Amino acid sequence: MAVRHLVTARELERMGRADLELVRGELVPVMTPAGEQRGTLAAFLTAELWAFVRAHDLGRVYVEVGYKLFSDPDTVRGPDVSFVSRKRQTTAKRRRGFIHGVPDLAIEIASADKPMTQLTAKAVEYLEAGTLLVWVVDPKRRKVRLHRPRQPVRTLSQTDTLDGADVLPGFTLPLSRLFAELEDQSG
């Protein structure tokens, strides 16, 4: 019987491939570059978070950065947008390549190549690794699903306001503003 080689985070880094993530040692293809809708929402969310985080000196906002969530076998995931608090920055191992640690907030945006079922599974992985809050954005249905440890998933519609809870206290974003970014792309 052949022994299967499990890929490590270091091997994935050496490959230099942005189109792969690592799940329990197995390479998983991811879509890159993003389509227009996903790119628009990721840019908008990054801008909103960046402004808030910088104004309050809370930490860092990242776009498509790889996080080594688990070891032996390794799992590396790259959310569309993420936030790492100052406190967590001091405990995460930062060096070239992937961040060895987890984000406080991970944001995933659904698209044809990233279905909600896949993103729900990723949200569970982030939470199991220690992420405090995951937003899964569904542009097609104009909804955002909020995942938190040991809490039921909450679904917000475009008439609701998204907030940063205890991860980004004081941050709010009316979802009508977020989804308005897609209005001129509906054709």
What residues fall within each predicted segment?
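Gly/Pro/Ser/Thr-rich low-complexity, intrinsically disordered segments predominantly at protein N-termini
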Residues: 1-187
